[in-house]
Amino acid sequence: MSKKPHSIKVPTQYRATAKILKAALEQQKCIKTLIFAEKHARTRSLHTVLKKFSENRVALEKAIEETGLLRDNPSFDPSLAKILVTELLFGRKELNGESKPVQTVRSYKDRLLNSIRDFGVQRKEPNPRYVRINTNLYSLAEALDYLHKSDWRRKELPADASYADFLTAIKSLAENEFMTDLHVEGVLIFPAKWSNYWVRHPLVHSKRFILQNKATCLAAELLAPPSGATVLDMCAAPGMKTVHICNVMQNKGCIYSVEQDHVRYNTLCEITKDAGCDIVKPILGDALNLTPERFPDVEYILVDPSCSGSGMQNRMTVCDEPKEDKRLQKLQGLQIKILSHAMGAFPNVKRIAYCTCSLWKEENEQVVQRCLQLNPSFKLLSCKKALRNKWHNVGDKDYPNIGKNVLYCQPDSDLTDGIFLALFEKRREGEKD
């Protein structure tokens, strides 16, 4: 005799996901931290369903309310209901098992679909998948040859193509097409639908291909240390930008990569080793304690400090994230300290790139403004000019001589993560504005 629905347990995966969602909503805890703390479920599956909920939360909650799912079933755990509805409408489109909650949600399927349809859910098209060639292990020619033999077709633009032409071409990539980036050599662009394909690809696992958003590649591109230079990466973990700098330098010279957290330091060591970075010297320590005596020959510095992360497109949020002025003030203070230390502590430094994955001016233009006031021996270079003027988004014009020279990557218009970049150069003796 078959079991009654009340006696059939909800699958562990659904219960674990609902537990995480409940903690995130009620305690405003970080979803990713909660996922990695969950020991009894498949983390990839948890991540997928919660991301779908994050992307469609307004429509899902409206559908649940309009159909009376929770009102008609008062004993139904709201978090579990949200997870099951997410899976049914936006995930695998089916539910496992015959438990009472699963059967209940299935019985509401048509009503839920009608509500979603009436709501007119308009999903934002995901940005493309960026894949960077790690030239320590694999050349551009080898990568292009591999793609050609794998039946990928390269979409090419004329030499005089504008940035607008480039963005239009990305949006119209056919399923089997890819492009090379307009700004960063070795960055390949694929349609968004292939994101998971590359996550599992052997070339990625062997570190010959690196999954790195184009926006974060601009830091090494703008810093542009030559082969043989001495570079300091002050806040280096997990190490993707360090590897890219190593590629720019053709694996010749020296890169000091600094990280103060033990776990992140170990990740930095592992990534740079696996990526074939012969010139990287990982250092466990605080960037603010770095001295010119220990690093006398530093010429180029990357400053990529802790920030709010407000520009990151892969963040999962299940509650509104208001601008937290107190937190931004603390972050700004730390950012000013680190960037100012980079400017003042190393006598042979020529160029500094400052980068955040934030879209808040408190962490960007205001930090640049204060550090230039504290360190008049430095000047701003134009990031837009460094990209041959093939860029649209610059800083706030309310910051004279700063806004026009700094650069923003905006998710909607640049099809990347949200990133801010500023480029500083040491003045020659006697040089003035």
Curated annotation (Swiss-Prot):
Catalytic activity: a cytidine in 28S rRNA + S-adenosyl-L-methionine = a 5-methylcytidine in 28S rRNA + S-adenosyl-L-homocysteine + H(+)
Organism superkingdom: Eukaryota
EC top class named in words: transferase
Phenotype of null mutants: Increased lifespan and stress resistance.
Any one GO molecular function term: rRNA (cytosine-C5-)-methyltransferase activity
Enzyme Commission (EC) number: 2.1.1.-
The entry's keywords: Methyltransferase, RNA-binding, rRNA processing, S-adenosyl-L-methionine, Transferase
UniProt-listed InterPro entries: MeTrfase_RsmB-F_NOP2_cat, MeTrfase_RsmB-F_NOP2_dom, NSUN5_7_fdxn-like, NSUN5_RCM1_N, RCMT, SAM-dependent_MTases_sf
Catalytic residues of the enzyme: 357 (nucleophile)
GO CC list: nucleolus
Pfam families the UniProt entry points to: Methyltr_RsmB-F, NSUN5_fdxn-like, NSUN5_N
Gene Ontology annotations of biological process type: defense response to Gram-negative bacterium; positive regulation of innate immune response; rRNA base methylation
SUPFAM superfamilies for the chain: S-adenosyl-L-methionine-dependent methyltransferases
Binding site for S-adenosyl-L-methionine: 235-241, 259, 286, 304
Function statement: S-adenosyl-L-methionine-dependent methyltransferase that specifically methylates the C(5) position of a cytosine in 28S rRNA.
Family: Belongs to the class I-like SAM-binding methyltransferase superfamily. RsmB/NOP family.
Classification via PANTHER family: 28S RRNA (CYTOSINE-C(5))-METHYLTRANSFERASE, NOP2 YEAST -RELATED NOL1/NOP2/FMU SUN DOMAIN-CONTAINING
UniProt name for this protein: 28S rRNA (cytosine-C(5))-methyltransferase
Lineage of the organism: Eukaryota, Metazoa, Ecdysozoa, Arthropoda, Hexapoda
This protein's encoding gene: Nsun5
